[in-house]
Swiss-Prot record:
Lineage: Eukaryota, Fungi, Dikarya, Ascomycota, Saccharomycotina
Function comment: Component of the Mediator complex, a coactivator involved in the regulated transcription of nearly all RNA polymerase II-dependent genes. Mediator functions as a bridge to convey information from gene-specific regulatory proteins to the basal RNA polymerase II transcription machinery. Mediator is recruited to promoters by direct interactions with regulatory proteins and serves as a scaffold for the assembly of a functional preinitiation complex with RNA polymerase II and the general transcription factors. Required for transcription of genes encoding galactose-metabolizing enzymes.
Compositional bias segments (type: Basic and acidic residues): 962-971
Region annotation Disordered: where it falls in the sequence: 101-124, 138-183, 281-315, 413-497, 655-682, 712-804, 951-1020
Protein name per Swiss-Prot or TrEMBL: Mediator of RNA polymerase II transcription subunit 15
SUPFAM superfamilies associated with the record: Kix domain of CBP (creb binding protein) (SSF47040)
Keyword Nucleotide-binding: no
Source domain of life: Eukaryota
Amino acid sequence: MDDWRSTISTQERSQFVTELAQILADMSRINGGEKANFNLEKLKKSAEQFESSLYASCNSKDLYLDAMRKRIAAMDSAKRKSIEAQRQKLAQAQAQAQAVQRQQQQQQQQHHMQQQGSGQQQANGIPANINAQMFLNQQAQARQQAQRQIRSTLTGQQQQQPMPQQPQPQQQQPNMMRPQLTLQQQQQLANELKVTEIPRELLQKIPNLPPGITTWPQITFWAQKNRPSQNDLIITKKVYQLHQQLLNKSKLQQSNVNRMNTSVQQPGMGVQQSPNQRMNMNQVPQQQQQVRQQQQQQQQQQQQQHKQQPQHQEPPAVLGRLNQVFTQAEQKMLYEAGKKMIENLQRSGKLPPNLDSQQQLLYIKKYMNQMVLKKMQQLGIPIPMPGSAQQQSQLLQQQQQQQQQQQQQQRQQQIPQVQQAPLQQPQVQPPQSQQAQSRRQAMGMKPTPVIPNAGVMKPQPQQTPQNIQQPMMQQQSSPPPQQQQQQQQQSKISVPRPTEQDMLALKKLNAEVTKNPVKLNDITNRLTNDQKQQIRSKLHANQQLFSSVESFIPTLYMLTRNEEHIRQLLQIRMLTREIMEKAVRGVFLVEPNVVDKVIFRYQKYYEYTKEQLLRRQQQLMTMRQMQNNNPNLTANDLLNQQQLLQNRKLNLAMQSQTQEPPQIAAQQQQPQQPISGVNNNSNMGIVLDSSLNATSRSGTNTMEFLNSPEFSAISPAVPSPNKDKKNPATRAVKGKKNSQSGIPTSNPQSNSNASVVNSRTATPTVIPGSSPMFNNKSLASGQQNSPSPKTMINSPPQQDNPYKNDELALKKMAIRTAELMSRYKHRKEVFVMSSIDLFLSTFADCLDIKDDAVDLVHKTPQPILDQINGTGKKKLSKAAQKARDQDPVEISVRNNKLLMPSKSEKTLRSFKIPIADITACFKPFADPKQLILNSTPKHDEKKRKFDDLEISPTDSSSELMSESKKVKFDSPDDMFLNDPSSVQETKPLVPSELGMYSINSKPSIPSSAGNMPAPNESTDSGMNIWDWNYWESL
């Protein structure tokens, strides 16, 4: 087996190792940026370890090369993705820098406006250097913050070094308090601590920390797993507090900048304003200022979230896959560990001591989500990326909100600019609002008060279109969210809601299924690595399908009202869960073909449920259209019209079927007879539980469409009064392939002998009009028969299958061939000591003589008889019993007769062949009744009647003695035979009582006896019946 390793040279292996190490080094440079710290030798060692493990584990050269190439390609694609991510980060950083520049330009414009009005502020007794100093401080902090954000975006780390806060000038107003973080900012700070990467300077202070851990949740998990010392925990706690302080300082700086912005945007009024105007401006409510501050804080927080999003995305929500990764016992352990974690955090003061049950449950869910995510990473399960469609829509909404807030901020900034403009400057035209106020003052009227959030004031008539066109374009480009929600609701399919009775019935069925779990054996050692990988990949690829079908179980019960269907689906679900739970641990219970069959069943259930929901929606839409076309119609009129249409469809389908007219008339005369279910062919579903066979349910209902290859062209079936017979022979022939998997399954082939009879289960009562499936009590029986796709109400009429008869003939031929082979095998086993019984029994089948009319010539040995009839003391093994159950015939020996009736047909099957085929073996004869052969004459016990001196070999003639030993007795070449001319006796092949000629009668046609050569013509081969040429010459 190691010959293939000699074909790979060390140079090729070293080349693979070099490629892997180079890719790892490139990825380290890309992710680390300028401060990337990696050792090429270590990377090369890790690449060598991977290559050596792969070299030792592979079974062939092709597997080794394929796995190595796939690994290199995957790493290369990951490198390309990292490069693309870095490009996006650079583009975002450039965009942020441009935004900061635009903001600085706006602030410079404001500063220019402030300098123009500084002389007037000094006239009022306000020092001019206050606003200038605040503006300079703001500019410096904005530059530092922009540089810090660009540097953190390029290096992949955020806020590695705390920037020193600029000292506040002593000339600020005395009433400005030291800014504090709000409750919302504190909560946001705690959330950022969970997802923000820890700077390398802080990580290096934590002792014994393995590489690759960069966040606090990872450190918490590592500490719970490795149990560090108390000294290490104290150092880690100090590092955590230091990291928290750094983030707190950055938040305080941001709040400082926000407060400065608000103070800059509220300058004093000019000297030439009247006292009333100054009073009105001083009487602006403080609520307006607080609203502006909150809006600016929210805007900056959202910008920071957007900046952090490409680097630190929130972990994806994978808690729904908890059952797929952990068992029930492990889930309980995780729950207890989450409780202990909350207690430890409360003791250390990181969480408040008085948490209610909902808050505790939220923290436990987050902890379990982290554990599921890590487990999925360890097992190699694909993890859904957080950039889903919902998050993209949220990002778009946030961007729209940002744009709206920016526009509001610009409008709010324009208000103080207009108020700051001196009225005596000839270069700037006065606003219309101020002109109106001056006119009212001249007329002795009161000035209009300033209304908070009153809208955008018009500084100039030329600027009006620019301020209005932007929100108008945004409103036209993005539809309102209410219309989008309505469109989404219209596109969704309406699902009927189960009642309390339905849920109770489902719980009862689930309890019945869980009482009898499926017992599967561990076949991990019998599977190859490729088969195991196939099972894993198939289970991972169809997880969404499994969860979708499980969520459809109540809906399926609402549509079918059949407990047997739901019971089988619950069995499949229980089987799938067990297979997936064990496969995650590396234990495999079934083969890949069984997984394919389970997936096939899930797909059929999903397609069936989806199709029925679509039909239900179409039915509701037709009813609405009819009501819209004729609003005077009542609900009963709509139901009656719909029933007429459905009856016409059913009549067309019934006319296309080949049924007896009295049966059709009887069905049409009793339209209100309730039929509770459908009994389809039972040999098509999976027998997942051995308890089902033990209980011997008669009339087990299964979905016929699960095995139908023409599922896409489903049409309603017409009820047939004849019950469909089970076909165990077909199940035995088609189920042999899966005998080793531990689950007897059936091949998914269509069964066209489906019939419609009353179901064993009782149908729950349904309120009339609650569902389109059951609109009125006067529905025809054909409409209430079956929930399957072939008997739905609004199904199109069935089209005749032109190949139906051919398919039935092929099925019967296959069953007949299987029975014929089984009969031949049993005859070889029973008649192992009796060749004549083997010939006569086979010949009786050719002549259409039944088994009960053929007596055996030799008595069957007692051990064989006990084994066949099952009368012996030794019981059959499981394998023998399984083979007997799958046998298409039932074998027994009764009254010295071998009986082998068919399991698929009660009547005895005919294996007769034409008489011409029998006589073809004997060409000169037209009828086997006239076939007469020369039998071997009877001889005495002592055959040596000749003189010993004449024919007996002497002592010296050893050659004669050796030749005589080779001669067979009773053969034509035996020298010790009587004279063949003395006794000439013929015997017919068939007894005379059957119409054959007797021994003394002459045949009507020349027989072989009449054409016999003379006795002295011993050299003629015409008499040698042992020679095949004799039969060929006839």
